[in-house]
Amino acid sequence: MISVMQQMMNNSNMPPPFVKSSDSHETHDESPTSPFIKRSDSPATTSSAAAAAMQHNFWSTRAAQLQQSVSGSSGVSSGSSSSASNNLSRTQADNHSERGSDTASSPQVAPLPTSSGMSMPAAAAAGMYPFNAGRFPTEFNMMVNQSMYNDFYSNSLAASSWPYSYPQQYPFANYSMPSLDGNLNDGGQLEWTSSSHAMRKKRKPYTKAQTLELEKEFLYNTYVSKQKRWELAKYLHLTERQVKIWFQNRRMKDKKQKQRTSGDPTGMLMPPGLD
């Protein structure tokens, strides 16, 4: 564009076409039908010089404006590209600063080696394995926080009512067991006994005097009638049921003795007419 404008400026300084110059001695009485325009060799007038100067100034000004516009557009493009690059660098710097602040605020935990070649933070290992590490290899001892292990078991032992030095292993260890020091035949009931057992009366053994009187009656009558049963119960301060049960047990005992001595499998025959 600039080269074209300069060429046009150069062409403006050339004389216009179809102009014929003539000497001063020639006359101007030629025919008006001549295709050429005569020009005298006299110096140019003031008006033609001013017009040529104005035309030259116009094209010079136009060329300068074009150069300024081209340089301005290139400057704008370069400025926009530089501003974009500055924004990108500023964003990257902000990201690096944020990453640095996060890295500085986060605690740095040194990794610990394990038997498999992997690394694990010590805090995570102590939280995941709160038990005794003595049963495991030496590499495993490095992952367990011994102070945390001691606090865990000491707190558990202090919170419980376990009377021994070692901690409880079962949740039902706090259950109080009943005392078994006393005699079980003293009529005391355990906690897990049912109510039906508590309703049963205590077994009372027969005294020697009662046993002697019952043995005398058994020598005469193996089976006792209701009247005799009532008399014995009243005399010996027993119930009729106790008298009846004693005679049943005594007959069974006598039957076994006779079977051992005589070998009779049937035993003693029951006398007729007795209950």
UniProtKB/Swiss-Prot annotation:
Any one biological process term the GO annotation gives: positive regulation of nematode male tail tip morphogenesis
Disruption of the gene: reported phenotype: RNAi-mediated knockdown in adults has no effect on their F1 progeny, but increases the frequency of posterior morphological abnormalities on a homeobox nob-1 mutant background. However, RNAi-mediated knockdown in L1 larvae causes defects in tail tip morphogenesis, which are exacerbated on a nob-1 mutant background.
GO CC terms of this entry: nucleus
Cited InterPro entries: HD, HD_metazoa, Homeobox_CS, Homeodomain-like_sf, HXA10/ABDB-like
Transmembrane regions: none
Listed name of the protein: Homeobox protein php-3
GO molecular function: DNA-binding transcription factor activity, RNA polymerase II-specific; RNA polymerase II cis-regulatory region sequence-specific DNA binding
UniProt biased composition (Basic and acidic residues): 22-31
Matching PANTHER family: HOMEOBOX PROTEIN ABDOMINAL-B
SUPFAM superfamilies: Homeodomain-like (SSF46689)
UniProt DNA-binding residue ranges: 199-258
Function: Probable transcription factor, involved in posterior embryonic patterning, morphogenetic movements of the posterior hypodermis, and cell fate specification. May regulate expression of transcription factor dmd-3.
Family: Belongs to the abd-b homeobox family.
Keywords from the named record: DNA-binding, Homeobox, Nucleus, Transcription, Transcription regulation
